[in-house]
C-alpha cells in the first residue's frame, strides 16, 4: 500500500473554503495543474532570457491562484517575487525565483498526487 505524503504547499481545505464544493475544487485543480505544467518552464525560460515583463505576467497569474490553493508561506513568497518583477533588477528577480521555483514544482507534484488519488486508474 503506497502512502502519499501530506502536502506541504497545497491546501485543499482552503480551496474548499473559497470554492465551496468538491467538484469545483477538482475542476480548478486540473486547470492549476495544466497552468503549472505549462507556465513554470516558460517562466524559467523568460527569467533566463532576462524578459522581466514576460516573467511578471506569469508571476501575476500565479499570484492570483495561490490564495485559493496554497498555504500562507507560499502565497507570501509568490507575492514577494511578483513584486520584485515589477521593479527589481533582473539578477535580483533571478535569485528570488531560484528559491521559489522548487516550491512551485513541489506544489505541481502535490496537485498531481491529489488528482491521481481522485481518479485512480
Where in this protein do the model-derived segments appear?
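Two-component system phosphorelay core
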Residues: 1-57, 61-121
